[in-house]
UniProtKB/Swiss-Prot annotation:
<feature type="compositionally biased region" description="Polar residues">
    <location>
        <begin position="412"/>
        <end position="421"/>
    </location>
</feature>
<dbReference type="GO" id="GO:0006281">
    <property type="term" value="P:DNA repair"/>
</dbReference>
<dbReference type="Pfam" id="PF09494">
    <property type="entry name" value="Slx4"/>
</dbReference>
<dbReference type="GO" id="GO:0006310">
    <property type="term" value="P:DNA recombination"/>
</dbReference>
<dbReference type="GO" id="GO:0017108">
    <property type="term" value="F:5'-flap endonuclease activity"/>
</dbReference>
<feature type="region of interest" description="Disordered">
    <location>
        <begin position="332"/>
        <end position="372"/>
    </location>
</feature>
<feature type="compositionally biased region" description="Polar residues">
    <location>
        <begin position="279"/>
        <end position="295"/>
    </location>
</feature>
<protein>
    <recommendedName>
        <fullName>Structure-specific endonuclease subunit SLX4</fullName>
    </recommendedName>
</protein>
<feature type="region of interest" description="Disordered">
    <location>
        <begin position="603"/>
        <end position="649"/>
    </location>
</feature>
<feature type="region of interest" description="Disordered">
    <location>
        <begin position="401"/>
        <end position="421"/>
    </location>
</feature>
<keyword id="KW-0227">DNA damage</keyword>
<keyword id="KW-0539">Nucleus</keyword>
<feature type="compositionally biased region" description="Basic residues">
    <location>
        <begin position="296"/>
        <end position="305"/>
    </location>
</feature>
<feature type="region of interest" description="Disordered">
    <location>
        <begin position="272"/>
        <end position="307"/>
    </location>
</feature>
<feature type="region of interest" description="Disordered">
    <location>
        <begin position="80"/>
        <end position="105"/>
    </location>
</feature>
<keyword id="KW-0597">Phosphoprotein</keyword>
<comment type="subunit">
    <text>Forms a heterodimer with SLX1.</text>
</comment>
Length: 834
């Protein structure tokens, strides 16, 4: 009930106000009642308002309690109570009005524990109603006392406070919050109300409250302190008090050095690390640590500078120094060195003399140990770009990475007559004229060359080259051995065999010309030509044998200069088992070479004899009715008289075949021979494109003069190549013997039959078949040289192949192949078959 309601009802209802102070621990006494007004004289509204402004409000709050001095202030409460109507609820007090003017006096006192004590006339009220009313008023009183601020007693009650006996005062007092009030309300000495929180989340207490148990037990008011601490703690959780602010402040102060979730742990290292010393303050221990760390870095980098075994390491070896980045640790270690030198120079004479040698050696080692980083000028940087090479790419890019040769060699190749030197280069897979320069730079890749073959590091057999076992003299001799074998072998093309006369074809055609003239009356010319031919054949055979004999002993390789690995490869190439002794390998290779050179000399003569026998046998079958005449002196010694007679008859009767009027049957039988020669020469023109011009017979001479016919057929402006001779021999022999297997199948068989060689120094030597499976680009010249020297010998194949045939085989099988060197566009397509 507020003041307006009291004012409106004060005229009709007499009020009795009384204050009863009660001390905790003492029974209440009705004698301590001071009535402010008499019931006989009710106050007027003006006096009531004046008394309300000076006295406390009608409701009470928690008394001022400090833990030691527990003083309960009784607060006068004005109530308007109906006489004989029980109060059933707080809302009925406003609605119900009493008709009788008789009033009752009720004194209500609030104690700390929340109990109520009513002192007054209880005779006019029933006990049941009173107790029931009091139970309902408990909740109302609790709610009203919880949220209001009570005023302190006025000056009229000061005398009453003096009469109240004071209890023992405790030290732990709760101060009154009245300092921040206004001047007008400072006399009231109000206690600050608890602030409400808008969000009902209790504040977490970081600091744990510490309670001294001994002090509580020693103090007489310890029980009250603990009791008030429990109530205050519950209420402070829902209000903004100073305890929460101080707890936040103590948290930041107490945990200043502790790590938090948002502070990285690495920052704590800076608190323990001492300050960076200046160069003048640096000690010898720092220098020792710097040198030790430097040595550790050098040791860590040393294993990377081992033997270069890959293409990438070979290619990037010369760029390693330029690609090194700046070492910041090294720059920091250089700074303390300069003051140390000054200290050495400023030392006394005795100390300087004793440590001068060590100091000097250490400085020299430090200066020469690591190269000084130098910034390259722009012009030099651009020049270095020009020197760089394209290292990786497709097979077409690899094909362009040919070794660099001098320009004079290419000019000599272009200016040679009928470009025969270009043809001979196929038989010699490596350059011999520039052995001292190109072997070290372009083939082995040890002097920083700029081609791809040096980076691949392949040896003469096409296997991976071993860089630590290089012998330039032995390698050059190995090249010369391959070159001489290719030159001296009758199947290969070379400069010594370039200008030889074909004994089998040219004299026969001369004989045909002369015998035709003899049939017309000039018989003496036939005998003269036969004599000339007999004289010519021994000379030519002697010349060929001399060239073979001269070619073999001069080019005998010096096996003593070969390395052990090369000797083992040579022994394995001949089909022998590995030999441990170096001397035994050298002696075995010399014997093998001697026997091979002898077989090469002897093979040249039987080949000529067999070719003549094949031709004569072909002519004998076609012409059985001819006279016997000796062929030549050299062939007469080896053959039986029957073969000599048959050959002589065929040679003597051949000119008659060219006269169609006299003998038409012989003309018809001879036409296939003419057509076969014509077709073969025409094929040589298409395949070799050497530039041969042969004028063929447009029509036969019906007058019987066949000289013009033979002259036109033999009008060849350029010498016939060995390929043409081989093709003639093959065509003539193929018609009477079983055709041999194709070269493609023989190449496949030879490559698959190559045995696996031993690994030298832990490096495996792959075979040709393994290289093909690994998609390693196959060099056509190397594979052709291996097939002619070793591959075909394992499978019993006598023929030989050139790079052109090998290229056709590679393209048919899908093998990646490249040319080792490019001499001209036409030479790549020259097939070489024997």
């Amino acid at each position: 009930m507020d003041n307006t309601a009291i004012t409106s009802q004060s005229s009709s209802t007499p009020l009795v106000c009384s204050v009863t102070p009660i001390i905790v621990g003492s029974p209440p006494s009705p004698a301590n009642v001071i009535e402010l007004s008499s019931p006989s004289t009710p106050p007027t509204p003006l006096t009531l308002l004046a008394s309300l402004s000076e006295t406390p409000s009608r409701k009470t709050t928690n008394p001022d309690t400090n833990g030691e001095n527990t003083i309960c202030h009784g607060v006068r409460q004005v109530r308007r109570v109906p006489r004989n109507n029980p109060v059933t609820g707080p809302s009925k007090e406003h609605k119900q009005r009493t008709r009788s003017p008789k009033t009752t006096t009720r004194r209500e006192i609030k104690i700390v524990e929340g109990d109520r004590l009513i002192v007054g006339h209880d005779k006019r009220e029933k006990k049941g109603e009173t107790t029931k009313r009091m139970k309902k008023r408990d909740g109302v009183a609790d709610k009203k006392l919880y949220a209001r601020v009570s005023k302190v007693k006025s000056s009229e009650n000061l005398d009453l406070d003096a009469k109240i006996p004071s209890s023992k005062v405790c030290n732990n007092t709760l101060p009154l919050v009245g300092d921040d009030m206004d001047n007008g309300s400072s006399e009231l000495k109000l206690e600050q109300a608890i602030k409400r929180r808008h969000d009902w989340t209790p504040t977490r207490e970081v600091t744990t409250p510490v309670v001294d148990v001994a002090e509580l037990h020693s103090s007489p008011c310890g029980k009250a302190v603990t009791r008030m601490h429990g109530v205050g703690t519950l209420l402070s959780d829902y209000g903004f008090s100073g305890v929460v602010e101080t707890s936040l402040g103590t948290k930041s102060e107490s945990f200043r050095n502790a790590p938090t979730t948002k502070r990285p742990m690495e920052l704590q290292k800076f608190s323990t690390v001492p300050a960076i010393p200046t160069p003048t303050e640096s000690s010898t221990t720092e220098d020792v640590q710097g040198s030790s760390s430097k040595q550790q870095r050098v040791k860590a980098k040393k294993p990377q500078k081992g033997k270069l075994t890959t293409i990438t390491s070979h290619a990037t070896a010369k760029y390693c120094v330029a690609d090194q980045t700046v070492d910041l640790d090294y720059i920091q270690n250089v700074a303390p060195k300069s003051p140390r030198r000054k200290n050495i120079s400023n030392r006394p004479s005795g100390t300087k003399h004793s440590n001068s040698g060590r100091g000097k050696s250490s400085t020299l080692k430090n200066d020469n140990g690591r190269p000084v980083f130098r910034v390259v000028p722009p012009l030099e940087a651009f020049k270095s770009f020009e020197g760089q090479e394209l290292l990786f790419g497709t097979s077409s890019q690899l094909e362009r990475g040919y070794p660099e040769y001098p320009c004079d060699e290419t000019q000599d190749t272009q200016n040679s007559p009928s470009n025969s030197a270009a043809v001979s280069e196929l038989a010699v897979p490596y350059r011999i004229s520039s052995e001292g320069k190109d072997l070290g730079s372009s083939l082995f890749g040890l002097s920083g060359s700029k081609n791809l073959w040096s980076a691949s590091a392949r040896d003469l057999t096409g296997a991976v080259f071993e860089g630590d076992e290089i012998d330039f003299q032995g390698a050059s001799m190995g090249l010369s051995v391959l070159a001489t074998k290719s030159r001296c072998h009758p199947g290969n093309r070379g400069p010594p065999r370039r200008n030889l006369v074909d004994v089998d074809n040219v004299p026969d055609k001369k004989l045909d010309i002369d015998t035709t003239e003899g049939e017309n009356g000039n018989h003496s010319s036939v005998a003269d030509n036969i004599v000339d031919r007999e004289n010519l054949n021994p000379k030519i055979s002697a010349n060929t044998s001399e060239t073979n004999l001269e070619c073999a002993p001069q080019n005998k390789p010096a096996f003593s200069r070969f390395t052990t690995s090369e000797l083992a490869k040579k022994v394995a190439a001949y089909g022998f088992k590995p030999i441990k002794s170096r001397d035994n390998m050298i002696s075995l290779l010399e014997k093998c070479w001697e026997t091979q050179s002898k077989t090469l000399i002897l093979e040249s003569k039987p080949n000529q004899g067999t070719d003549d026998a094949r031709k004569n046998g072909f002519r004998k079958e076609n012409h059985s009715d001819v006279r016997v005449r000796p062929d030549s002196a050299t062939l007469a010694n080896r053959r039986s008289p029957k073969k000599q007679q048959a050959k002589a008859l065929s040679k003597f009767q051949e000119p008659n075949n060219f006269l169609p009027i006299e003998n038409s049957t012989t003309t018809a039988s001879m036409l296939p021979i003419i057509s076969s020669h014509t077709i073969l020469i025409n094929d040589d023109q298409l395949s070799d494109s050497v530039g041969e011009t042969v004028s063929f017979l447009p029509s036969l001479d019906h007058n019987g003069n066949g000289t013009t016919i033979q002259e036109n057929m033999l009008e060849i402006k350029s010498p016939a190549t060995p390929n043409a001779r081989r093709s003639r021999q093959g065509s003539s022999s193929a018609s009477f013997s079983i055709e041999p297997p194709s070269l493609a199948s023989q190449i496949t068989k030879a490559i698959k039959s190559q045995p696996r060689t031993r690994a030298f120094n832990g490096l495996k030597q792959p075979t040709w078949y393994e290289k093909i499976l690994m998609y390693d680009p196959i060099q056509l010249e190397d594979l052709a040289a291996w097939l002619n020297t070793d591959g075909f010998g394992r499978i019993g194949e006598d023929r030989e192949v050139g790079p052109g045939v090998v290229r056709e085989w590679c393209e048919s099988k899908g093998v990646c192949c490249v040319w080792k060197k490019q001499v001209s566009g036409r030479s790549h397509y020259l097939p070489m078959v024997s």
